[in-house]
Amino acid sequence: MTPRIPPLPPEQWPPEMNEALAALRPPNPRHPFPPRDPSRPKGLNILGTLAQHPELARAYHSFNGHVLFASTMSPRQRELLVLRVAHVRGAEYEWSQHVIQGRDAGLTDDEIVRIHTGPEAPGWSTLDRALLTAADELVADARISDGTWLALASELDVRQLMDVVFTVGAYEVLAMAMRSFGVELDDDLPPGRKSPSP
């Protein structure tokens, strides 16, 4: 795939991109920021693409910073939703980056493989199954069905229910952007992180 919007290398990022990156860090995080590790993929292709429009990047990062670091859901629950959206949408970049974050959040390799099958795969807890079903329903219909809502509401509070919807929405938008802009996988992505097409 050839990028429709070529990513800017970091040395060409406009100064406003620093504000956009800072917006990823909410003032009251509930979850830790990822460790600074030079061996981890840096996501330069998506960040370099967003650097073409730093005002948009800042606005999206403020929203995404909540989803990643201030959400009332656990990181594991968040990553179940993100990876399911990435798989259903065929968003290889999103999938590849979030396999790493999913493992950091406690997802096992077996669970990551089962995300491809979805909520009907054996072995999910009732809540995990409801989260995956909610992701599928939101992507397909922009609405969580009554049955799935009841299953979620039996274990999640109001803020968590809201965070479910906004997490799926955040990564649905990002999947659309990455696929439409033609964002390519980064060279520093370790082998075996790529998702087969849905």
What are these regions (language model features)?
Residues M1-T2, D37-P38, E55-Y60, G90-W95, ...:
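Short acidic alpha-helix initiation/capping motifs at coil-to-helix transition points
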Residues S125-V165:
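Acidic/histidine-rich alpha-helical segments that form the ligand environment
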Residues L47-L50, Y60-V67, L80-A86, I115-H116, ...:
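Short alpha-helical scaffolding segments that buttress acidic/His motifs in well-ordered protein cores
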Residues L56-R58, V85-A105, D109:
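Conserved alpha-helical segments that form or flank metal/cofactor-binding pockets of metalloenzymes
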Residues A151-A153, Q160, G169, V173, ...:
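Acidic, carboxylate-rich catalytic segments that either coordinate divalent cations
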Residues M1-M73, P196-P198:
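Mobile cap/lid helix-loop segments that border enzyme active or cofactor-binding sites
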